[in-house]
């Protein structure tokens, strides 16, 4: 045996440890480093051949190690990582299963740098770790079925003593269990800690002898690498002695029923600190009985090896919780050299190795814990690594997106793989699991995609895109800057680039004219007036500076601006190729700038509309803002309009239905208009003309763009001597130079005149406009035909323009949501008309057609609608822009537009006086009116029919005036009055009817149109803050003050239910209250005629839809009390005033449905609220109560 063992005990892997003793000693301690099993070794059921367990630091040899003073051997947990052990165990298991090695199979050598190889001989084999990794501290004890000592001894093979080289050790009686190493009795229940092998007391041979278990101490005494003594416990079944580390097996264990003939795992002492209970051992044995004998033997061997290895390899750790017999629970880790470790199979993994002990949760040995930790770490790493990778990727992408260098698409693109991770990780960092863990560092959407509470995803996306485009523009701006245009770093810069000509005009007509000189066709003599409007009233950005900058730049950037703006205009006028060419770059620039400009420039009513659009859609809002800004900017800044068409072309989304058609149909023209900033003026003028026909409000818009007439001139020059056709035009042309309104009027006139100058071209354009208008075009045609003379020609161009204006206007009506759309449409229409008049005119008609078809409002309809809409539009604009911007735009950009805004109540009329003032440029005044009408059309008011009638009459009168010869002037006027026109009364009525229907539809579905017609983004209109009640209220502060004393209905509107609905914030309540107050004024005071002031609020209120509170108020005649305070909990403190007559009943309803929640508490005379409390007693009520006071 010894020889066999010696052979088997070759140092594993050249283990430095050699056999400590050359020969076995007759010591009671068996001197075999390997466990010898008496009799043939049963093969494991699983087919794993018994594995020799190497002593960690010693090669186990058959020769007995020099007898070491017996020492308590402890199992040191020094296992490889759990994963490694599992892998090895699995491999081993597979190998064993395949080999099906018999117990007596040739000894298998396990080489371990630390562990000596042990071969199993026929006589015996070294115990090998079982497939399942065993707990380092667990010791396998053969199950002895509680045999008496004698029986136990007898059960041991007689050969045992011989092989052991010593007589079998007598076993102490079961009652007097002893540590095998100490020989101290170990009561079954007694808990004992195995002393660290280093410090463990050495067991005397006697103690070993006393123990039936033969132990071999193959290690150096106290040497951490030394293997603990192995105790051979005879197995009743196998007749072999199973080696166990000293102190592992106790008589109690052997005696214990749990120790049956089958081999069981004796819990190995995990660390010196581990505590064992005999009961645990017994339980373990009992549990092990479930396992097959071979499995148990294998496990026992493994445990012994493990223990020996551990004890030899690593010092025990004290205080480690003792390993519990539960094999499943314990995931024993074997030493790296351990075969089981190599196999990596843990006892847990072994299907048969299930909880052997009664205790399901064994105290894990330090080694087991370590393995568990390692495993967990490995898992975490596995999770973390990918996550880290994703995380790294994400930051890059996110950063790029933030920087805007990455397109929003790029983020999704780069992120996709990571995005899921990011979303999983970012959204659910740790919850997402392994993958999410790595992704969690990453953020979901990049900041560029961050959405504001009031913006939709689409808006956020647009905003992000705009940002990206802005970056691109910056690149372009760098180029432009090289050209002295300056970078497009700001709206003004973009405006300069986009509407460089208008800016130049604004900056200095001389400069612009010089630019125009090179771009005569553009015919964009920059009107100084627009220059004066350098600052966007909406955004406050100085358009003046940009324009002057452009004015400065024009000479140098004139190359770029001319190429882009000028060439855009020229080529747009001359051909669409250039505009299209510019459009790719400029649309981005324009769109971005326009949006921003609209945000800034949309001071004009168009801007208000733009604001509405903005309200509707952050993105579309911008686009709309761009449109509005374009119109307004066109009004306010010629460049804006020019840009607006581009924006429309490029930003069809915001302009959507209208601009998509117009811009697409007139894309070249839009490009032209955009490219040639004067074209923007032209657009404005055309818008004026369009609105002049449809409503010449845009003429008013054009008022601010004096350069427009020069643009028109240039356009007309390109189209032909169109300026000449109208006396108004000639005069207006100076007016454009002198005053925008005259210029625009002149332009509008010029547009009509253009047909004259352009002759068939203009008429053809007009015809196209009519075609586009279809419905409107008949009126337009009629109007045009009504004035076959020069005015008639002017009318035709006007009709062309008007259809365009109408077309844009109806889209606003359609879009009702945003006057910007109307403005855009008007601008687009005017530009189209201008372009139509010009070579680009042909494309314009299609655009008009699209626009007109979209609107399909007759000029007269459009006109009346516009004035009518003007009011609602003003209200809407007021809601969005509070009507302040439009007015501002009005002044700076165009009296007509601003007047139109001012005209909200008497919209058409107010603009008309300025228009009349502009009548010097007749069309201008008319255009102003038309512009207002156009805006009104956008905002379709409730008083459509009346205004339509007025518009019709005015249109007829104006048309007549236009026919009289001032053509442009009269036409503008007529357009302002009739929109399309007076030219053809029948057409005008038809248009009016259509317009009424459109207006009514717009009015009725104003909000819906805003949300629905407003492109998908537009629906945000309601959401936009510009539409917030507070903003709406500011417009009618007077009404609010009047209705400030809340009537019962007023209180009701502010009722807690409503408050809760709104989120009970005092500010919100005030806003609501104010709006309610407005409603109250509408109901109570609505009759009283603040129509100018109340008109908007009243219309606004209807738009808002009456609330039950409004309708349900029992009486509007008297205010019952006031809302004193709103509390965070949603309750309101009301101050009720008893009517002088005596008792009164009132119900304070709460939305939460808790009638008893309120508590009336009479308070001392409340701080008088405007005398509410002075009337009789004041009651302070909590709004959740239903109270009747008598």
From Swiss-Prot:
Spans annotated as Disordered: 1-77, 98-223, 313-366, 378-457, 613-663, 685-823, 831-850, 877-930, 942-999, 1015-1063, 1087-1106
Biased composition annotated in UniProt, kind: Polar residues: 102-111, 343-356, 747-757, 777-786, 1039-1052
Biased composition (Low complexity): 425-434, 814-823
Superkingdom, natural source: Eukaryota
Basic and acidic residues bias locations: 402-413, 685-696, 703-716, 898-912
Gene Ontology cellular component annotations, sorted alphabetically: apical plasma membrane; cell cortex; nucleus
One of the GO biological process terms: establishment or maintenance of cell polarity
Residue ranges, compositional bias (Basic residues): 378-388, 647-660
Name of the protein described by the UniProt record: Uncharacterized protein KIAA1614
């Amino acid at each position: 045996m010894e020889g066999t063992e010696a052979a088997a005990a070759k140092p594993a892997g050249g283990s430095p440890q050699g056999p400590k003793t050359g020969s076995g000693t007759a010591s009671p301690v068996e001197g075999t480093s390997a466990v010898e099993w008496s009799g043939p070794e049963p093969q494991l059921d699983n087919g794993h051949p018994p594995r020799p367990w190497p002593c960690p630091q010693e090669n186990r040899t058959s020769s007995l190690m020099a007898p070491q003073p017996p020492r308590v051997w402890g199992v040191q947990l020094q296992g490889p990582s759990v994963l490694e052990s599992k892998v090895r165990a699995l491999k081993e298991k597979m190998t064993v299963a395949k080999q099906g090695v018999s117990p007596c199979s040739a000894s298998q050598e396990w080489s371990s740098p630390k562990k000596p190889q042990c071969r199993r001989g026929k006589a015996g084999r070294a115990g090998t770790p079982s497939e399942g990794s065993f707990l380092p501290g667990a010791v396998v004890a053969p199950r002895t079925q509680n045999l008496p000592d004698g029986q136990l001894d007898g059960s041991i093979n007689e050969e045992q003593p011989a092989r052991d080289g010593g007589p079998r050790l007598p076993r102490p009686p079961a009652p007097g269990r002893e540590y095998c190493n100490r020989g101290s009795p170990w009561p079954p229940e007694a808990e004992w800690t195995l002393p660290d092998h280093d410090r463990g007391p050495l067991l005397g041979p006697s103690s070993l002898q006393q123990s039936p278990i033969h132990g071999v101490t193959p290690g150096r005494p106290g040497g951490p690498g030394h293997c603990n003594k192995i105790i051979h416990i005879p197995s009743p079944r196998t007749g072999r002695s199973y080696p166990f580390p000293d102190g592992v097996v106790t008589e109690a264990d052997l005696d214990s029923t749990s120790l049956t003939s089958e081999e069981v795992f004796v819990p190995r002492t995990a660390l010196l600190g581990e505590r064992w209970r005999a009961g645990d051992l017994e339980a373990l044995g009992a549990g092990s009985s479930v396992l097959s004998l071979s499995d148990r033997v294998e496990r026992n061997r493994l445990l012994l090896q493990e223990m020996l290895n551990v004890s030899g390899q690593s010092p025990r750790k004290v205080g480690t919780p003792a390993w519990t017999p539960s094999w499943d629970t314990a995931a024993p880790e074997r030493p790296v050299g351990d075969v089981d470790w190599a196999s990596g199979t843990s006892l847990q993994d072994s299907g048969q190795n299930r909880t052997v002990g009664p205790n399901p949760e064994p105290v894990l040995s330090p080694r087991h814990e370590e393995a568990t930790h390692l495993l967990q770490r490995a898992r975490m790493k596995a999770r973390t690594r990918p996550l880290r990778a994703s995380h790294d990727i994400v930051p890059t992408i996110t950063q790029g997106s933030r920087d805007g260098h990455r397109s929003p698409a790029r983020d999704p693109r780069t992120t996709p793989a990571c995005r899921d991770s990011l979303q999983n990780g970012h959204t659910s960092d740790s919850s997402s699991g392994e993958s999410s863990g790595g992704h969690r560092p990453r953020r979901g959407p990049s900041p560029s995609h961050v959405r504001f509470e009031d913006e939709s995803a689409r808006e956020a996306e647009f905003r992000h895109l705009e940002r990206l485009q802005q970056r691109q523009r910056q690149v372009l701006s760098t180029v432009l800057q090289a050209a002295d245009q300056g970078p497009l770093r700001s709206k003004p810069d973009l405006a300069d680039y986009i509407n460089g000509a208008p800016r130049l005009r604004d900056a200095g007509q001389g400069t612009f004219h010089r630019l125009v000189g090179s771009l005569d066709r553009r015919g964009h003599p920059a009107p100084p007036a627009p220059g004066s409007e350098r600052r966007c009233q909406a955004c406050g950005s100085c358009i003046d500076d940009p324009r002057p900058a452009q004015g400065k730049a024009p000479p140098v950037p004139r190359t770029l601006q001319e190429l882009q703006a000028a060439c855009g205009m020229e080529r747009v006028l001359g051909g669409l190729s250039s505009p299209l060419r510019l459009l790719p770059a400029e649309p981005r620039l324009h769109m971005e700038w326009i949006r921003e400009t609209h945000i800034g420039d949309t001071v004009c009513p168009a801007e208000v509309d733009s604001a509405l659009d903005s309200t509707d859609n952050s993105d579309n809002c911008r686009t709309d803002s761009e449109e509005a800004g374009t119109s307004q900017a066109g009004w306010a800044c010629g460049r804006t309009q020019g840009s607006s068409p581009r924006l429309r072309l490029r930003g069809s989304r915001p302009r959507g239905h209208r601009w998509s058609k117009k811009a697409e149909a007139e894309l070249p023209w839009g490009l032209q208009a955009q490219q040639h900033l004067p074209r923007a003026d032209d657009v404005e003028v055309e818008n004026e003309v369009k609105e002049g026909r449809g409503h010449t409000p845009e003429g008013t818009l054009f008022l601010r763009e004096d350069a427009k007439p020069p643009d028109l001139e240039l356009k007309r020059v390109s189209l032909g001597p169109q300026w000449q056709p109208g006396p108004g035009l000639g005069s207006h042309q100076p007016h454009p130079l002198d005053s925008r309104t005259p210029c625009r009027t002149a332009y509008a006139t010029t547009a009509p005149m253009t047909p004259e100058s352009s002759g068939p071209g203009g008429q053809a354009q007009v015809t196209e406009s009519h075609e586009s208008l279809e419905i409107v075009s008949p009126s337009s045609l009629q109007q045009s035909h009504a004035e076959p003379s020069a005015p008639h020609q002017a009318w035709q161009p006007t009709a062309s323009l008007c259809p365009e204006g109408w077309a844009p206007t109806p889209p606003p009506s359609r879009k009702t949501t945003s006057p910007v759309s109307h403005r855009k449409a008007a601008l687009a229409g005017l530009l189209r008309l201008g372009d139509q008049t010009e070579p680009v005119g042909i494309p314009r008609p299609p655009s008009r057609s699209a626009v007109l078809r979209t609107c399909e409002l007759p000029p007269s309809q459009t006109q009346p609608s516009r004035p009518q809409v003007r009011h609602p539009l003003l209200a809407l604009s007021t809601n969005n822009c509070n009507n302040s911007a439009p007015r501002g735009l009005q002044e700076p950009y165009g009296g007509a537009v601003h007047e139109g805004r001012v005209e909200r109540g008497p919209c058409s009329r107010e603009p008309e006086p300025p228009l009349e003032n502009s009548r010097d440029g007749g069309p201008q005044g008319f255009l102003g009116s038309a512009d207002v009408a156009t805006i009104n059309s956008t905002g379709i008011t409730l008083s459509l029919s009346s205004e339509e009638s007025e518009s019709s009459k005015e249109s007829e009168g104006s048309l007549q005036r236009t026919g009289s010869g001032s053509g442009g002037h009269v036409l503008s006027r007529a357009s302002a009055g009739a929109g399309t026109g007076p030219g053809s009364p029948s057409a005008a009525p038809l248009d009016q009817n259509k317009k009424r229907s459109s207006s009514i539809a717009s009015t009725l579905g104003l909000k819906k149109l805003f949300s629905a017609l407003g492109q998908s983004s537009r629906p945000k209109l309601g959401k936009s803050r510009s539409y917030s009640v507070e903003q709406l209220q500011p417009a009618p502060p007077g009404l609010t003050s009047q209705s400030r004393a809340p009537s019962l209905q007023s209180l009701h509107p502010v009722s807690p239910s409503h408050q809760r609905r709104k989120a009970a914030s005092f500010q919100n309540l005030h806003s609501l209250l104010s709006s309610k107050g407005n409603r109250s004024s509408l109901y109570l005071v609505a009759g009283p005629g603040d129509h100018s002031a109340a008109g908007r609020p009243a219309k606004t209120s209807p738009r808002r839809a009456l609330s039950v509170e409004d309708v349900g108020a029992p009486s509007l005649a008297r205010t019952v009390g006031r809302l004193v305070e709103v509390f965070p909990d949603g309750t309101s403190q009301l101050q009720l005033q008893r009517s002088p007559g005596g008792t009164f009943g009132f119900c304070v309803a709460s939305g939460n449905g808790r009638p008893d929640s309120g508590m009336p508490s009479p308070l001392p005379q409340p701080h008088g609220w405007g005398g509410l409390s002075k009337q009789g007693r004041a009651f302070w009520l909590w709004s959740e109560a239903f109270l009747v006071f008598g």
